Amino acid sequence: MKKEINFLGKRVRRVFMILSLLFVIIGMYFFFTKGLNYSIDFQSGSVIYYKLSSPLNSNQIANLRDIARSFYSKSTIQTGSNGKEVWIRTKFLEENELKRLTPEVEKVIVKYEGREITTIEPTISRELREKAILAAVLAIIVMLVYITVRFRFDFAISAIINEAFVLLATISIFAISQWEVSPSFIAAILTLLGYAINDNIIVFDRIRENSKKYPKEDFTIIANRSINQTLARTLYTVITTLLAITPLLIWGGVVLRPFILAIYLGIIIGTYSTIYIASAILCEWRELQK
Amino acid sequence: MNIRPEIKTAFIVIILGIAIWILLTFPFRYGLDIRGGIRVTLQCQKTEGVEITDDAVRRTIEVIRNRIDQLGVTEPSIYKEGSDKIVVELPGIKDPERALEIIGQTALLEFKDETGKTILTGSALKNAKVEFDQVGQPMVRVEMNPEGAKIFADFTSKNVGKQVFIVLDGKVISNPVIKEPITEGTGVITGRFTIDEAQKLAILLRAGALPVPVKVIENRTIDPTLGKDTMESAYRAGVIGAILVVLFMILVFRFLGLVADIALLIYVVLDLAALKLLNATLTLPGVAGIILSIGMAVDANCLIFARMKEEYAQRKTPMASLDAGFRNALRAIIDSNVTTILAALILFYFGTGPIRGFAVTLSLGVALSMFTQITITRTLLENLLSLPVFKKATKLLGL
């Protein structure tokens, strides 16, 4: 028999569980004090985006800032791709205000490859946010029911705590780093919740199978063996998924980058949490029952 | 299921044939983020005496659709969102400002007498078109329906010498004096119009007034060059990603990996064909979802093959380990994929625009990959593993 790695030893798993909890607590502290950096889709405001063929110099950027601030004093100018992309963010501008702002801006930015203007009123954003929360809650309930039916109730609870951890950990990372949260972020979060539960269920399936095969064996040993047995598959899938999306991160353009970044995080968090959240909780639970 | 391998093979070949045919004949429908255009969200405004009911919103959408049809936009999409919002998406439009003016204007036309009493509204009109007077000044000729014509004839015969006020959205656009009774049910609206203004007015009058006024609360103008650039680079990145996955599978699982790669290729063909068949709108996050699904599709194979390796260590024949590998891995694959599809369904139900597109591509990808990576891989392997070559050369199988 191949040598097994002891993932779920009592001390190791408790250290990791406490560290995970600490991370989420710090993340939530940031979430409640600093909040998330919502993209314009979640808040009211106007953004004018330009893609340029040659980068702007600092003089031009200062000019743009002055122009935008003459409309709204807290406007910001953000550049990307070495100055070849510009975002001008202001408060919500009415049609006629936008019609005055853009010609002024285009006195500075004379030539551009592409332009995108987005304006959103606050009512929309509230609805979007509420829908996102509702979708997350519903997804969790549906998974809880499905796993209880297919496995056992304690499996379902561990899996849901695992999902909650993945969600909170991702939000923590975005709260601490202040990366922008856009609508595709919601799609990404739901995908990575799917990825995490996928990974989780593959391991739980092995635990279910091994528990039937060796009903007398200590549960923690069974769980640890199951993780070891599925380790090869876990590794392969992490690699193939990363291979598929990494080119997109490199060459896929700015628009998709936050989405792919969130998927990356999800793969790492999901793989980790299957072991140190889902399986670890299940072990604690079973040891308590003894 | 005990279906003979030949029948399964024939079934797969037929499906693949249909998919390739669809792929070659049907076009892709790209979302606004790729094609460019405008996306406007309108909110219906409550006014005196008019409540925002479902019916009012529906009729408003109808009028907006009529107006857009006259603009000649290809594949516009107009739909209700929430209780009182209307989303209008116009792909590939050249003059977004003009379109916005035409969509958003209430265009309530009223004929009023000198006391300000309304005699007729725009709903009494049958047609409106642009004409020119002797000096080439544009004007709009309106044609009334029979009841309208009768009311107007009555009114004009009683009020010769008085003024009639033609009011659009509360603003007087002309106030001619009635010289003689107008009985034939046509009239002209003159004003100091430019040709463009006259054309716009004619469109608005033909399509009718909005039952409730609307306000633009979200307005996105997306330049087509941006989306096209991203699409092209995403396409290239997707191809590179797929090649990397294919190579990895061969490297790790040898011949088994190659078979999984063939199934993966079939998966991509089926997936794209299904998207075309469903006329799904392909957005940028949707494209990312397709690429992601290529990486995740082979997960089933990794599970099965990893299991086959384990089983082979105990059973020693490729066929027996194939059977046990599939049988044992299937449970885990189904349980994990069903949960993913459930999550995707919730996304679809609550999501909007691009997110819905993403949910469609995700769940379609999971369902199809289960078919290709399990059924097709198995059928191929059942046919191939009985070949004499594999009796001894198990190294080739990567077991």
Curated annotation (Swiss-Prot), chain B:
Keywords: Cell inner membrane, Cell membrane, Membrane, Protein transport, Translocation, Transmembrane, Transmembrane helix, Transport. NCBIfam families: 2A0604s01, secD. The chain crosses the membrane at residues 7-27, 239-259, 262-282, 286-306, 329-351, 357-381. This is Protein translocase subunit SecD. The keyword Signal does not apply. It is a multi-pass membrane protein. Forms a complex with SecF. Part of the essential Sec protein translocation apparatus which comprises SecA, SecYEG and auxiliary proteins SecDF. Other proteins may also be involved. GO terms for cellular component: plasma membrane. Part of the Sec protein translocase complex. Interacts with the SecYEG preprotein conducting channel. SecDF uses the proton motive force (PMF) to complete protein translocation after the ATP-dependent function of SecA. One of its GO terms (molecular function) is protein-transporting ATPase activity. It is found in: Cell inner membrane. Its main location: membrane. GO terms for biological process: intracellular protein transmembrane transport; protein targeting; protein transport; protein transport by the Sec complex. Belongs to the SecD/SecF family. SecD subfamily. Signal peptide: none annotated. It holds the Pfam family Sec_GG.
